[in-house]
Each structure stands twice: as structure tokens, then as C-alpha cells.
């Protein structure tokens, strides 16, 4: 029994010495005593390759490469102890979830924390840390007693409570494992116990290589190996000079020196012979003097400069993507020009979550074989999502999001259907569910679902059309596809008495869906597309899910569990599943995390993402215990993993290891912006390297090749996939600024694409975008007729939409595009309800020959309740009856109608105008409809403007009959004559024109009527602020003012007094007009003369004719208006269709000048030739 250390700085040949000794021993005595070669988990594969890579050693039974965990398996298989079931990380998380749920009421700190994402991962890590550092539940309990007895501050009490919770959960976890299960940490403890019984290890030659430190648990394994083995050789990265000095925590080799001392102490305790240490002083790894200098002087203060030609490259990149592309180009150059193999190259980084997706895409585009050494979660795989969402459907009462997450995994689809067709049908089905608000018991009810197109509150026709019947049949067929398998599982889960039966229900759910066959189809498809890594995912995920179910049954199979807890525990297990990373080939670039990688035999290393806060790492308080809490526990005798401070001290050694991996070339880079454009700073580490290599020039990596020299630009010509974007960039530049002769090689690249049989068609679409202009081509007369018909029949809103943006009009009325219906109450629905409610009250008054003025306050309240109760079942598929929230909203809407009724009552009392009719149709056909506004366009097409007028009021005096239009609005609105001039606000004046033009035939007395005005009535329930103790009358008066109707009224004092008979002088509380003492109108009055009303009506006719002409001539310009802070695009539903982009030359807003009403009126006069 002896111990030997092999020490040396990075690259001194420690591993090489050990491997050569083993290879020589195998060559001399191939059947001798066991040789164990122990390395960290991530080094096993490459060490095994290196061991048998010699020409003299092609294989070996005698020598084996192990990690500690694999050695535990080997020993336990030999001497026994492996019969207990192994539970992996997913099983641990599931067991902890069950323990926490059952203990929840007794927990002090973790009761609410258990619901946070990542809690069980942190808890599992904490328990694993306890075990690695030989801390038992009883140790934690004793610590709690000690803390509890001396807790005075809030921080101390929090720590005591936290330790108490940890002790409870740790103890429960250990009790659950005893005699039944083993987790990863238990194997190492068992290895310590079983090593003395192992014939395989007894007398073995043991090498321990690649470690920098050992946990207390691992140190116990090393102790037993020294006792059992013939000789233990341990390599450590230490400079021999360090051992001759006192241990200093600021020393580069502080961590490994501590490890050296700890192992020597163990050897002395066990009376193990300590052989003479072998110090290695040379630097055989480094073929580059610069890299040898970097290793030898890395920790020197001040920095030792290297003035020769350095094989170190430092780069900054415009952004993260540019950085990765720069790395990809350099890798291709190394392979093509310097005959590197891909396996000679490694990319090291720390913030992989920012880089991996980009690297996966770009390295594939550059045809660089690569392997990303990362643990990928299975949580996004369709199978995992299918199980999780199906359980959420059942436990969450069939909520929409859970149902369609399950549907979109496509595992519910029948095996024999065409997926493309099924996807389209499911999209329609989802639209139905969204429109009808389908959830809860509607899924489980046997009643068939109904399909009716929602038209309006007036549509009470119960007839179903053939197309509606066909759609209804399809919806019910798809409903059964979704619900049948889930309901079967739901029934089984509810019948289940034990966890085993619940797991069986999940398994049967998957079997009945033919999931194995569907996954096999996905695997074959992935292989056919050349995606072999993802092809293996589909095999792995089925095996892992089956293993998870087995583990669940083994651990908790006979227990009873509620459905909600089963769902939570299963979800926790599924979240912990990860794909095993198996390198698909030997010759590939390795992409690895700086902290976990153990590279060897690499010629070139790229260290990317070297930004401040990343390398070196910024301190982060993660996990269950803070740094301060760890220090308290450490002071009390419980040693745990290093604190942030200790980790920061070790960071220098991590970076030293990082820069000393390569033998020939080192590349260091950082981006100046992330993927979202956020600014990033270069790390101070780059400054350190620059000081060591003053001759190294900092290069800049960009994706814009225009500022680069010819030789630099040539390097951007890589694979056809990648180069095409740079050709486009050059062509765009030439198009804008002209041709530069010294870059004519880009024409050669362009010619490759347009002449290549393989790329001609692929590139033509991309290259055509060079001449892309986002313009909508004018429709031909024939197409326009097909879309709009020979007679254009449209509402005023449609005409206004055309003037806002002709393309939006085309999308809505030509292509009939619309957003999908959602089961929610929008402003138009509320507006429709208000209109219908007020009409019903007004109709009732007309039938009873009463007016609003005749109503009492109590009647107003009664009628508002009555009409809302009548309308609610008809509105938006009974949305107001669908939930408590909507029921509350119904009450609020009823209160608004009540308040509005009171105001209408007050208005009626003060007005000589009375309602003639409400919801007056024109151009709609049928009894009671006024004729449309008709136009014969120059091109022979007829156009009819149709609509429905909210309310028409009439007043009569000695001067004649006057009509006014009242339009109910759920938001405040004014009549802006500038908007009238631009054709954006035509509705009110059109309505006024229709009623005055048809007054003689429409009204019973049969004589003409004059325009009295157009007014907006804002339906709302305002809140008013009053100073002091205001009386109820004062409050009501203030509320009345909030309902002042805005618009445009006839500039006739008598007519205005008919609208507000309380007005003598001053401003009216009812309309936007006021009178001075001399009888003239105040400056703030919104008035127009009868002649001006006539001009406005002529202008409206003129505008409609222009709109009709443009529509029929196929005008569909993408030219939205913009006026001040108003723009057509603000609430437009078709932005994704027109793709309006101000950065394009062709896409600019139609800027409209805002004007005063007087200026707008003058321009309107000029247009129609009015006086």
C-alpha cells in the first residue's frame, strides 16, 4: 500500500505519464492484477479512447476507466448491495414532491416556496450536498437545536426555521430510501463500505487523474482505495514551488494544494507509505511559444509580456450572432487551410443558454460537425407535454390552454390520418372552442355541441343552414378525437385506489394512443432528414417515461394519492427528465461549458462570450442557503460546498485551466450586444491577456461585409447556405451606392447561384427580394367586379375604412379576412348591448305613447334591469352568464344603462326634441327601411351606402320641422371637420342627409325637414370629484355635465333653445353650444349654418363618389393615413398581412395636416364649389 503524487502545471504531461505507464504495463503483463483508472465523469469517454489509442494496446481486460459512480456499480455487482432499486434525479424529485406535499402544514419556510419553479431541483441538490459532505439528518437536527437556542435576530430565526424544514425533509427522504432505494449519492457511500470486500480492487494499481478537489465523501473513497490498492497514483495540477510555501488562498493553485495536503493527511492516518512526489517541469503540450508563455506566467504580477508572434487571437463582435459566425469561419479555415481535424478544435463558453441554439443553427449552416455537451431537458418533447397537459386537463377541469397544449403534441391524432389535414381541422376546431368559450363540463357532457354563426342581437332565427350543419358534424367528430382518450384515462384515475393503478391509467392512455408507433414514425422522419441526434430523442423519451412510471410504482405503488398530488408529483418527475448526450461521431467540434469540461488533446480552443459578469463569473447567491448562512453552519462544524467567496477565489484557477487547454492556437472573443441588442461589456480578463501579448491586435467581427477589405470579404464566402445572405448584402449596397470594381468576385459568387442546377431555384426567391417593393398592385376591373360585385353595397364605416387605408378595405371587404372570434366581451359587444338596451326601452315607451321625460327614477332602474336580463342570453353566446366575473360585469353594465336612462330622462325634460325612431335602417330593404344613398359611378357601377341610424329626434316650431341625429357611443367622441374633409368621419352627416332627404315620405305629415344637428351621446357611468360637502342635487348636476352631447348643431338660437329649453345665456349642460347676452353664440359653440350643413352634405356625396370610383377601379394602395398622433395602423387587424414597414422606401404614411374647423370648412367649400 503506497501513495504517489504526480504534480505539475497544466500541460506538463501528468495524464500522459500515467497513461504511458498503464500502456507499458499492459504491454508487458496483459493479464496481471487490476489497473483502475479513475477520472471525473465527463473525462471517461476521452480517457478510454486515449488508453487504447496506442498501437501496442488495442484493448484491455486488465485496465478499466471508471468514474466514482461507475466504480460503485462495479463493486456492488461484485460483492452485493446493488439489489436496491436505483432512483435517478427524476425519481428523487418525485419523492421529494410527495414528502413536501404531505409535510406542507408543518413547514415553516418552504410551505410557499415549494410552489416556485426549480424548488425541487434546489432541494434535491441540497440533500445531495449533505450526503457528499457526510452530513446526516441527525447532524442537521443537532444544528437546528443549536441555532434555535441562540436565535435572537430575524436572520438567525429564519436560518433556524430553514434548517428545521431541511432536517424534516431530509429525514423523511432518508427514511423513504432505507432498505429499498439508492440515489446517486448513496452509491458512493456504499462504495466506501464495500471496497474492503472487493477482490477486484484489492491489490489493484490505481490511478486517479483529472481531479482538482474531493468532497468529504469522495475523500473517504480515496482513503479506502489507498487501503485496498497496491499503489494509488494521484495527479494534481500544482506548481512544485507552491508546495514549498505556506498555503495562501490567493495562490493560483490554492485549491489543489489543499487537496494535496488533505490526501497526505489521510495517508498518514492510515499509515500508508507516501512515495516521492514526481514533479513534471516541462511543457510538452504546448507547440506554441506564446501558449507556453501564457501558461508559465499566467499568475505573474505584474503581467509578463510576450513580444514574439503570438498564436493568440482576441476579437470583439458586433453581436452574439456575428461572434458565432466568426468562430465558424475560422474553424472552416483551420480545417481547410491548416489540415486540422474537427476533433482538434473545442469551443468553451459559460452562458450556454444564450449560445447553444444559435450555435446549433449556424454550425449546421456552415457544415461543421459538432457536439454540444449539454443536458437537454425532455420537458418540450411531445410525449412529455402530452402526459403533463392531459393530467392538467383532468385535474384542472378541462381548461382551454391545457386541452390545446395536448392537442398540439399531435399524439391524440389517429394513427391512420394525414397529419396536414388533421392540423387544419384542429385549427378550425380550436377557433370554435375559443369563440364558444368551451371548457369544463362541456367537454365531458354527452350533449352534442351546437354551431351557429353569430350575427347580431336581433337575429333570433333558430334555423340551421347546411354549411352550419356540416361544420357542426365536424366539430363533434373532432371533439371525440380529443376527449375520448382523455376521458378514459380520467375515469381510470378516479377509480384507481393506488398509485400503481394511476400509473397504469397513464400507461394505458399512451398505449391506446399508439404512442410507440407514432414516436417510431417521428424517429424515421428525423433520420430521413439527417437529424440523427433528434432521431435518438424519440427512443430515449419513451424509455425514460416508462422508467419514470416504473420508479413511481416502485416507490409509492401501494400508496393512495389524490389526483392533484399525483399530477404534481408526475409533473415534477417529467420536468427532471433529460436526454443523454451521446456523441454521434468521433470527428467533431466539441462545444462545452468551461466549468464542467475536461478537455485533452486539443490543438485550438475558442473561448467565447468573455463578457463582464460571465468570465470571471459574477457572484450569485443560488440554492437553499445563502453565503452568510453557509458561513454560520461552517463555523458550527458543518462543512458544505464552497461559498460564493470561495468560488470567486477558485475562478482564477478555472480560467487558468481554460486558457491552457489548447496546444497550438487560442481564440478569445466577446460580443458587444446580445441577441436582443442589449449592450454587453468586455471582460477584464481580455485586458489581462492583452497586457501579456501587447503585439496582439484586437480584431472586430461584423456581419456587415461592406466595410471590410477584399481579402477579409473573401473569408465570408463559405457554404452556399451562408454565403447567399452576404451576396444579398452586396447587391443591396450596389443598388443603393453603385458598383465597386475591386469587389467583383461577388459577381462570381452571384453567377454560381444563378447557374447552379442545385441552387438556381433556391436562390431565385431570395434574390428576387432585392427588387421587392411592398406595393399592392392595382386590381383589374374583372377582379374588382368578382370581389365586390356589380353593385357595391356598403356601410359608411366601410367607406371611412377605405379612406383610412385602401389596403385594409381590400383585406376586410375584398378578401373577407377577419380575426378569429374569441369568447370575450369586447368594446363592440358592449356597444351593441348598449344600443339594444336603449332601443328596447325606447320601443316600450313608443308603444305606450310615453317619452323619456315620463319615467321616474325607479322606472329607469326597473327597465334597465329588465332589458339587460332580456339581452344577456343573446349576447356573444351567453357570455354574460358564463362566469361570476361576467355576472358582475353584467351588473355594472346594467348600472350604466340605469345612469344613461336617468340622463335621457333629464334631457327629455329640457328638450323640445323627441325621438322619432331608433335603429332606423336605410338601404336594408323590408318594412320601415329608408332607401339607400345611391350613386351611379362613371364606370357604370352602382353603389349603395346603407346603414342603421341610432336615433332620430324631431322638433317643430313656427319655422318648420327640424331633425337631428343622436349617435350612442361607449367612448367620448367629437365631430372633427378635418376628419370629415379627409373622409374619415362621414357617418353622422350621412345619417343626417338620409333622414332630411327622405323626410317628406318618411314622416307622417309629409313635409320637408331642416337639419338641426348631429350629436354624440356618451354612454357611461361617470365618477365626479366634488369639493366639500356637496348636496345630492349638486352631484347630479355635475354628472349631467359629463353627459353633454358633442357634435355640430344648427347655428340658430331658437333651435338650440329647443334642444335645451333651460338655456338663456351661458353654456348649455346638454349640448356643446352656448349663448351670449346679445343672443349670439359663444366662441366655443360647435355650430354650422343651414347653408354649411348643405355644403357638408354635398361634400359627403362627393367623397362617396370618389371612394366608389377608387374601389371599382381596383385601388388597394398600402397607404395608411397619419394625422398627429392618430394613424390607421394603430388598431388595424391586418398589419401582418400588408407588412407595412416605414423603413422601406415604398411604405410611408399618408400624412394629413390637422386643421381648425374653420379652415377645414373652407377647404370643403372649395371642393364642392360652395359659397
Swiss-Prot record:
PANTHER family: RECBCD ENZYME SUBUNIT RECC. The keyword tRNA processing does not apply. PROSITE patterns: UVRD_HELICASE_ATP_BIND, UVRD_HELICASE_CTER. This is ATP-dependent helicase/deoxyribonuclease subunit B. It holds the Pfam family PDDEXK_1. SUPFAM superfamilies: P-loop containing nucleoside triphosphate hydrolases. [4Fe-4S] cluster binds at residues 805, 1129, 1132, 1138. It is an enzyme of class 3 (hydrolase). Despite having conserved helicase domains, this subunit does not have helicase activity. Keywords: 4Fe-4S, ATP-binding, DNA damage, DNA repair, DNA-binding, Exonuclease, Helicase, Hydrolase, Iron, Iron-sulfur, Metal-binding, Nuclease, Nucleotide-binding. Residues 1-390 form the UvrD-like helicase ATP-binding domain. One of its GO terms (molecular function) is metal ion binding. Binds 1 [4Fe-4S] cluster.
Amino acid at each position: 500500500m503506497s501513495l504517489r503524487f504526480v504534480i505539475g502545471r497544466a500541460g506538463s504531461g501528468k495524464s500522459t505519464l500515467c497513461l504511458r505507464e498503464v500502456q507499458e504495463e499492459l504491454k508487458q503483463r496483459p493479464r496481471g492484477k487490476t489497473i483502475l483508472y479513475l477520472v471525473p465523469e465527463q473525462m471517461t469517454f476521452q480517457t478510454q479512447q486515449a488508453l487504447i489509442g496506442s498501437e501496442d494496446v488495442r484493448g484491455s481486460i486488465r485496465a478499466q476507466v471508471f468514474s466514482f459512480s461507475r466504480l460503485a456499480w462495479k463493486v456492488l455487482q461484485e460483492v452485493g448491495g446493488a439489489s436496491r432499486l436505483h432512483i435517478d434525479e427524476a425519481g428523487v424529485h418525485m419523492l421529494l414532491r410527495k414528502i413536501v406535499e404531505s409535510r406542507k402544514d408543518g413547514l415553516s419556510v418552504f410551505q410557499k416556496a415549494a410552489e416556485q419553479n426549480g424548488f425541487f431541483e434546489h432541494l434535491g441538490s441540497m440533500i445531495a450536498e449533505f450526503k457528499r459532505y457526510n452530513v446526516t439528518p441527525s447532524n442537521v437536527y443537532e444544528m437546528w437545536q443549536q441555532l434555535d437556542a441562540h436565535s435572537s435576530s430575524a436572520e438567525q430565526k429564519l436560518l433556524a426555521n430553514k434548517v428545521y424544514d431541511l432536517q424534516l425533509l431530509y429525514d423523511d427522504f432518508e427514511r423513504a430510501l432505507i432498505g429499498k432505494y439508492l440515489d446517486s449519492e448513496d452509491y458512493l457511500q456504499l462504495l466506501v463500505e464495500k471496497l474492503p470486500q472487493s477482490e477486484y480492487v484489492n491489490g489493484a494499481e490505481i490511478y486517479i487523474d483529472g481531479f482538482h478537489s474531493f468532497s468529504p465523501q469522495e475523500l473517504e473513497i480515496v482513503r479506502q482505495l489507498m487501503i485496498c490498492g497496491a499503489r494509488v497514483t494521484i495527479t494534481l495540477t500544482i506548481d512544485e514551488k507552491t508546495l514549498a510555501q505556506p498555503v495562501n488562498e490567493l495562490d493560483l493553485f490554492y485549491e489543489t494544494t489543499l487537496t494535496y495536503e488533505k490526501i497526505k493527511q489521510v495517508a498518514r492516518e492510515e499509515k500508508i507509505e507516501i512515495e516521492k512526489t514526481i514533479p513534471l517541469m516541462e511543457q510538452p503540450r504546448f507547440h506554441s511559444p506564446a501558449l507556453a508563455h501564457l501558461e508559465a506566467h499566467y499568475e505573474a504580477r505584474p503581467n509578463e509580456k510576450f513580444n514574439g508572434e503570438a498564436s493568440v487571437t482576441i476579437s470583439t463582435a458586433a453581436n452574439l450572432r456575428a461572434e458565432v459566425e466568426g468562430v465558424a469561419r475560422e474553424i472552416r479555415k483551420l480545417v481547410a487551410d491548416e489540415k486540422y481535424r474537427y476533433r482538434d478544435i473545442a469551443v468553451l463558453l459559460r452562458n450556454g443558454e444564450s449560445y447553444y441554439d444559435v450555435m446549433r443553427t449556424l454550425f449546421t449552416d456552415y457544415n461543421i460537425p459538432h457536439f454540444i455537451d449539454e443536458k437537454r431537458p425532455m420537458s418540450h418533447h411531445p410525449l412529455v407535454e402530452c402526459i403533463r397537459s392531459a393530467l392538467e386537463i383532468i385535474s384542472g377541469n378541462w381548461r382551454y390552454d391545457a386541452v390545446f397544449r395536448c392537442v398540439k403534441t399531435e399524439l391524440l391524432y389517429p394513427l391512420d390520418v394525414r397529419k396536414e389535414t388533421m392540423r387544419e381541422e384542429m385549427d378550425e376546431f380550436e377557433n370554435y372552442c375559443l369563440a364558444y368559450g368551451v371548457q369544463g363540463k362541456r367537454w365531458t357532457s354527452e350533449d352534442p355541441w351546437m354551431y351557429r354563426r353569430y350575427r347580431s342581437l336581433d337575429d333570433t332565427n333558430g334555423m340551421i343552414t347546411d354549411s352550419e350543419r356540416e361544420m357542426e358534424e365536424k366539430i363533434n367528430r373532432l371533439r371525440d378525437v380529443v376527449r375520448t382518450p382523455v376521458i378514459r384515462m380520467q375515469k381510470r384515475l378516479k377509480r384507481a385506489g393506488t398509485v400503481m393503478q394511476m400509473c397504469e391509467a397513464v400507461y394505458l392512455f399512451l398505449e391506446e394512443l399508439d404512442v410507440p408507433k407514432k414516436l417510431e414514425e417521428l424517429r424515421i422522419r428525423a433520420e430521413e432528414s439527417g437529424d440523427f441526434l433528434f432521431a435518438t430523442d424519440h427512443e430515449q423519451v419513451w424509455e425514460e417515461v416508462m422508467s419514470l412510471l416504473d420508479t413511481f410504482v416502485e416507490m409509492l405503488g401501494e400508496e393512495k394519492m389524490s389526483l392533484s398530488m399525483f399530477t404534481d408529483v408526475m409533473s415534477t418527475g417529467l420536468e427532471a427528465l433529460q436526454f443523454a448526450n451521446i456523441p454521434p461521431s468521433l470527428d467533431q467540434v466539441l462545444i462545452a461549458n468551461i466549468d464542467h469540461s475536461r478537455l485533452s488533446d486539443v490543438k485550438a480552443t475558442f473561448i467565447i462570450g468573455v463578457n463582464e459578469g460571465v468570465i470571471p463569473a459574477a457572484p450569485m447567491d443560488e440554492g437553499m442557503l445563502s453565503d452568510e448562512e453557509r458561513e454560520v453552519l461552517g463555523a458550527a462544524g458543518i462543512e458544505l460546498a464552497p461559498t460564493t467567496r470561495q468560488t470567486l477565489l477558485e475562478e482564477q484557477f478555472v480560467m487558468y485551466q481554460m486558457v491552457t487547454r489548447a496546444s497550438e492556437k487560442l481564440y478569445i472573443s466577446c460580443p458587444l450586444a446580445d441577441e436582443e441588442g442589449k449592450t454587453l461589456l468586455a471582460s477584464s480578463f481580455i485586458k489581462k491577456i492583452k497586457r501579456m501579448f501587447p503585439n496582439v491586435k484586437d480584431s472586430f467581427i461584423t456581419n456587415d461585409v461592406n466595410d471590410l477589405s477584399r481579402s477579409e470579404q473573401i473569408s465570408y464566402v463559405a457554404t452556399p447556405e451562408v454565403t447567399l445572405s452576404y451576396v444579398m448584402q452586396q447587391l443591396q449596397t450596389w443598388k443603393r451606392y453603385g458598383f465597386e470594381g475591386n469587389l467583383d468576385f461577388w459577381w462570381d459568387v452571384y453567377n454560381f447561384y444563378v447557374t447552379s442546377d442545385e441552387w438556381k431555384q433556391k436562390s431565385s426567391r431570395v434574390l428576387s427580394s432585392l427588387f421587392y417593393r411592398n406595393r399592392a398592385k392595382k386590381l383589374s376591373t374583372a377582379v374588382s367586379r368578382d370581389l365586390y360585385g356589380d353593385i357595391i353595397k356598403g356601410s359608411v364605416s366601410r367607406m371611412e375604412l377605405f379612406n383610412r387605408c385602401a389596403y385594409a378595405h381590400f383585406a376586410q371587404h375584398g378578401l373577407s379576412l377577419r380575426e378569429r372570434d374569441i369568447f370575450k366581451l369586447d368594446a363592440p359587444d358592449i356597444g351593441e348591448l348598449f344600443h339594444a338596451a336603449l332601443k328596447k326601452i325606447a320601443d316600450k315607451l313608443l308603444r305606450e305613447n310615453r317619452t323619456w321625460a315620463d319615467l321616474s327614477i325607479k322606472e329607469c332602474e326597473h327597465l334597465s334591469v329588465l332589458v339587460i336580463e332580456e339581452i344577456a342570453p343573446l349576447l356573444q353566446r351567453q357570455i354574460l352568464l358564463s362566469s361570476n366575473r361576467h355576472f358582475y360585469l353584467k351588473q355594472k353594465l346594467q348600472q350604466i344603462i340605469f345612469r344613461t336612462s336617468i340622463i335621457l330622462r333629464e334631457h327629455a325634460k329640457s328638450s323640445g326634441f323627441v325621438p322619432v325612431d331608433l335603429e332606423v335602417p336605410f338601404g336594408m330593404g323590408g318594412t320601415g327601411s329608408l332607401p339607400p344613398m345611391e350613386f351611379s359611378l362613371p364606370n357604370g357601377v352602382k353603389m349603395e351606402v346603407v346603414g342603421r341610424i341610432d336615433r332620430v329626434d324631431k322638433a317643430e316650431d313656427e319655422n318648420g320641422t327640424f331633425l337631428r341625429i343622436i349617435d350612442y357611443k361607449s367612448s367620448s367622441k367629437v365631430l372633427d371637420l378635418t376628419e370629415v374633409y379627409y373622409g374619415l368621419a362621414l357617418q353622422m352627416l350621412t345619417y343626417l342627409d338620409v333622414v332630411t332627404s327622405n323626410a317628406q315620405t318618411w314622416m307622417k305629415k309629409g313635409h320637408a325637414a331642416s337639419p338641426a344637428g348631429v350629436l354624440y351621446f356618451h354612454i357611461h357611468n361617470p365618477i365626479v370629484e366634488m369639493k366639500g360637502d356637496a348636496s345630492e342635487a349638486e352631484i347630479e348636476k355635475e354628472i349631467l355635465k359629463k353627459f353633454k352631447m358633442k357634435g355640430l348643431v344648427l347655428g340658430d338660437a331658437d333651435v338650440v333653445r329647443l334642444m335645451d329649453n333651460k338655456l338663456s345665456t351661458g353654456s348649455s349642460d346638454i349640448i356643446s353650444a352656448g349663448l351670449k347676452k346679445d343672443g349670439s353664440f359663444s366662441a366655443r359653440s360647435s355650430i354650422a349654418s343651414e347653408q354649411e350643413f348643405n355644403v357638408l352634405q354635398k361634400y359627403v356625396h362627393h367623397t362617396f363618389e370618389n371612394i366608389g370610383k377608387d374601389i371599382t377601379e381596383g385601388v388597394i394602395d398600402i397607404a395608411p393615413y397619419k394625422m398627429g398622433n392618430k394613424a390607421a395602423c394603430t388598431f388595424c387587424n391586418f398589419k401582418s398581412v400588408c407588412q407595412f414597414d416605414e423603413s422601406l422606401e415604398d411604405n410611408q404614411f399618408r400624412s394629413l395636416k390637422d386643421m381648425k374647423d374653420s379652415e377645414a370648412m373652407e377647404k370643403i367649400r372649395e371642393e364642392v364649389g360652395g359659397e
